[in-house]
């Protein structure tokens, strides 16, 4: 619909997974974008770990480019990220545009941290994320069964299995208040509350 209303669009940018852990239907979006002759770009900043839990990368699902922040869900240093490419956008084009958002003096410390994070993910990290996904699944069930809070589940939307999102809708507690309770009473720090 948006591409029909904006035929001048030169690309489509989506976020998947988003901050709440919701995944977009990348194969369907890629199909639509490519039918209109525009590339699909994915902000996968919070999805560097997804391969470890059995989720295909945006590129494997048909996206043209995907930006992945290795420092957000992998043990890489802050500001480290990688750009995944399907090859449909010529490498020369990427090189020409790199100075717009990159540097001519890359940090070898950041590059090394990306490589160490990759090695960890291929080794112990896969097991760590499998355990995390199992714990999140158990927490989703327990919260849904024993509290007044709603949790995002796979039945409601396709999700990152390692992201726990608790909703305060239809309760007398706000997200910020729940975050404070978790911190003060249980020593649990929420990454975000809104």
What do the predicted segments below correspond to?
Residues 1-153, 172:
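Conserved PLP-enzyme active-site core in the AAT-like
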Residues 138-194:
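Conserved C-terminal alpha-helix-loop-beta "cap" of PLP-dependent enzymes
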